[in-house]
Amino acid sequence: MPVEIEPWEGIKNAYQHGPISKQVLKLKPFYTYRGLHMLEEESEDCQNLNIWAPKGGAEKKPVFVWIHGGGFFGGNAFEEYSFEGANLARHGDIIFVSINHRLNILGHLNLDQYGEEFKDSPNVGIADLVVAMKWINENIAAFGGDPENVTICGHSGGGGKVQCLFQLKDAAPYFQRGIVLSGARSDEAY
């Protein structure tokens, strides 16, 4: 299960993106061909987020949380320049947040048959999202955001993750609205 970050003193340099989850090797040529940010540092310690906040403007700005696509096995919070939130934050007068979390076997391998301590193993990638949403709720006001006005949005696999968060009572206090863009199918063929 994810571990919440320990507080630190002073200012934390956040000028570079944090590591992304380990990626499926066969997808790397596709992403590289498209010029996407897929050659970033990969790590199991990839639970990080990016925040864009405009200068000035209204207090208690709406918060828009982006959950990337890529199924539950690939992608990252800044894989395309169009997913960086600077322009939307600036022109929409919102706080834009994107989340990295564990994917593939690091986030969804089911080990519960090996004992009680592994009962939550198939859901640690989703648990990463819940912990990120909790952090946003507790800290977004420091960036000018309103923790009572949070919309989560995801496309493709990210849409499926938004659907998962809608079903979790642990996630419910941390957002008020959700947008699913081509989310997960629910039939057995998926």
Enumerate the language-model features and the residues they cover.
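A short beta-to-alpha transition loop/helix N-cap that caps and shapes the active-site region
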Residues: 105, 160, 184-190
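Short, well-ordered amphipathic alpha-helical segments that serve as non-catalytic structural scaffolds
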Residues: 129-137
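Non-catalytic accessory segments of hydrolases
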Residues: 1-126, 147
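Surface-exposed acidic, glycine-flexible loop patches that form ligand/cofactor-binding
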Residues: 53-60, 138-146, 169-173
